[in-house]
């Protein structure tokens, strides 16, 4: 089975391009940037229907990672994460591709208070409560996915990804970390399961202090093995922040908003922020 990875030259894309072939998947990349290694890749932009149509030929599933990675001015968010997301789903529908794994984000629910009590885990179907325009765009993608499932019978897993990194970078990520190996395990499970209709799934490792439930992922066959607790905090960056009372962390603070990023150049269209 050939799987198309959009955003294949980005961080998660490169990681999956290394790990998924060992799990039996034949991959094709789609990105504006050149491919890493010997990955078969179609060069193009996710807002270009013709380029997407070419990339979808012979594909059985799509892992949609491409998009604006963090907060940005609205035109950037709109083009990459709304128009681009729509074009990917439409191209999949035209090509008869029935399964999509969509990279959503915890920032789709970022203003949700972090859980307390026992068990202190938010369910995967926590309602949208976005913390930024970026988060709004990810909530849009989830709603669009639901539409394509209900209207066209597609099968979609929306991964509310936490902090994707080689190791946990800060205190918050001790709860939100998704290791590269567990990311591959999660995507592999979503591609293989015969139980998929529409699913919201937390993209998180088996962290002993995680805020989010892995129940939905495990029902699809996800078996996370990595735990942020095995990594010892060794720097002042591991001090807890007041913003960690909300799921979105620093994205929820008053001084984090469009004014902060208005002068930035757009990032490469591949998702991942914590």
What residue ranges belong to the model's regions?
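Conserved C-terminal active-site "lid" loop/helix of NAD(P)H-dependent oxidoreductases
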Residues: 200, 206-223, 238-270
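Alpha-helical substrate-binding/gating segment
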Residues: 161-167, 177-199, 206
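N-terminal Rossmann NAD(P)H-binding glycine-rich loop of SDR-like oxidoreductase domains
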Residues: 3-23
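Catalytic helix-loop patch of NAD(P)-dependent Rossmann-fold dehydrogenases
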Residues: 79, 115-153
């Amino acid at each position: 089975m050939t799987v198309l990875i959009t955003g294949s030259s980005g961080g998660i894309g490169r990681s999956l391009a290394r790990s998924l072939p060992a799990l039996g998947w034949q991959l094709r990349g789609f990105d504006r940037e050149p491919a890493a290694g010997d990955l078969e890749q179609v060069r193009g932009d996710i807002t270009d229907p013709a380029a997407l149509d070419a990339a979808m030929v012979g594909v059985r599933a799509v892992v949609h990672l491409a998009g604006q990675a963090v907060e940005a001015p609205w035109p950037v968010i709109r083009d990459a994460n709304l128009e681009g997301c729509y074009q990917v789903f439409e191209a999949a529908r035209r090509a008869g591709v029935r399964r999509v794994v969509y990279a959503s984000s915890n920032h789709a629910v970022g203003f949700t208070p972090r859980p307390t009590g026992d068990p202190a885990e938010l369910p995967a179907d926590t309602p949208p409560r976005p913390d930024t325009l970026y988060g709004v765009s990810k909530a849009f993608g989830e709603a669009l996915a639901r539409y394509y499932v209900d209207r066209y019978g597609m099968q979609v897993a929306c991964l509310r990804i936490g902090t994707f990194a080689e190791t946990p970078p800060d205190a918050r990520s001790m709860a939100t970390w998704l290791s590269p190996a567990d990311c591959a395990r999660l995507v592999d499970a979503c591609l293989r399961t015969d139980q998929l209709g529409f699913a919201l799934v937390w993209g998180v490792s088996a962290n002993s202090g995680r805020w989010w439930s892995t129940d939905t992922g495990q029902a699809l066959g996800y078996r996370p093995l990595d735990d942020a607790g095995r990594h010892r905090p060794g720097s002042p960056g591991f001090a807890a922040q007041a913003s960690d009372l909300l799921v979105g962390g620093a994205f929820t603070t008053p001084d984090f908003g469009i004014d902060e990023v208005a002068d930035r150049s757009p990032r490469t269209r591949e998702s991942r922020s914590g």
